[in-house]
């Protein structure tokens, strides 16, 4: 995906063609695309890569993978309101429990592939149950008016899933212990709601935007420190672009041009060999093979979404 979104790319380099050949060799009869595990996660990022190719030859593979992702949505018949995993997506058979990270990536892949699905000419394609998906997403948000789960804060931020947060808990002034939301999942929550086409005035959207403005920082992934920092940068760029947000306003009223600030931050962290790496190893971010694509795709997202200067009037 990073290579294909290069704004200076001319054609498809031979080594990328080989990469696509390898990727397609990993597609299963179910439509899933993965090697040894994490079926839904790997299929989601594979769909994004295949869509980036622009090749009609990949459409059949994309549609099969899209159908697989839709089939992985948790559907707990007869217990939908009680089961906190209902409507979301998990890593796969080894870990079926829904989480917001995989759910948002699956939604992104499905939405990205929608135009191919609509133009396939093969009849009506399967669709995600968006109402159930938003029920799961709402249960990941710290917002009392729309979350029926216990132990949540009321600040609009998002947790990893409906039962827990990777940022742990915090104690409120009244002594209650609640889940602490954090940056990367809050941007993932915003993106999920945009993919579901929620209105910008929806209280869930308003609440998370407020939290993201007030907690903006590039020094850390707010709530979890240096953990998942480049994942945070990546989902930040995608969410703010999708939300048509050009500036953020911090608690002290400072206006932030997030594109400029984020690009400068990432470029300042590039190593001499051209790669990026996170000194914190959580979620494999000590591996340049993972973090460098995060950084490159983030920069490409910034470049592609930059507002065009107004044409001079005659």
Predicted segments with their positions:
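An alpha-helical repeat/solenoid feature that recognizes helix-turn-helix modules
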Residues: 1-15, 29-67, 71-264, 268-311
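Surface-exposed loop and membrane-interface regions of Gram-negative outer-membrane beta-barrel proteins
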Residues: 20-32
């Amino acid at each position: 995906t990073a290579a294909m979104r290069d704004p200076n790319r001319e054609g498809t380099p031979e080594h990328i063609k080989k990469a696509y050949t390898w990727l397609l060799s990993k597609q299963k009869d179910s439509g899933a695309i993965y090697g040894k595990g994490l079926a839904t996660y790997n299929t989601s990022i594979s769909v994004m890569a295949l869509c980036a190719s622009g090749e009609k030859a990949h459409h059949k593979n994309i549609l099969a993978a899209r159908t697989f992702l839709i089939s992985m949505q948790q559907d707990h018949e007869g217990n939908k309101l009680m089961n906190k995993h209902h409507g979301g997506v998990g890593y796969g058979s080894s870990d079926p429990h829904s989480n917001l990270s995989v759910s948002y990536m699956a939604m992104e892949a499905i939405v990205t592939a929608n135009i191919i699905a609509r133009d396939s000419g093969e009849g009506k394609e399967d669709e995600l149950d968006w109402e159930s998906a938003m029920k799961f997403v709402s249960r990941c948000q710290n917002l009392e008016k729309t979350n029926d789960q216990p132990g949540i804060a009321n600040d609009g931020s998002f947790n990893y899933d409906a039962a827990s947060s990777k940022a742990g808990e915090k104690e409120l002034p009244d002594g209650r212990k609640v889940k602490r939301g954090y940056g990367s999942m809050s941007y993932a929550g915003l993106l999920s709601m945009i993919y579901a086409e929620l209105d910008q005035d929806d209280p869930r959207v308003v609440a998370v935007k407020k939290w993201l403005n007030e907690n903006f920082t590039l020094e850390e992934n707010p709530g979890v420190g240096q953990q998942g920092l480049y994942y945070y940068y990546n989902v930040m760029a995608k969410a703010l672009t999708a939300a048509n947000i050009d500036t953020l306003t911090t608690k002290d009223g400072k206006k932030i041009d997030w594109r400029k600030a984020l690009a400068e931050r990432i470029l300042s962290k590039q190593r001499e060999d051209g790669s990026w790496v996170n000194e914190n190893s959580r979620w494999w971010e000590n591996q340049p093979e993972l973090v460098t694509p995060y950084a490159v795709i983030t920069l490409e997202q910034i470049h592609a979404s930059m507002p065009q200067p107004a044409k001079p009037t005659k």
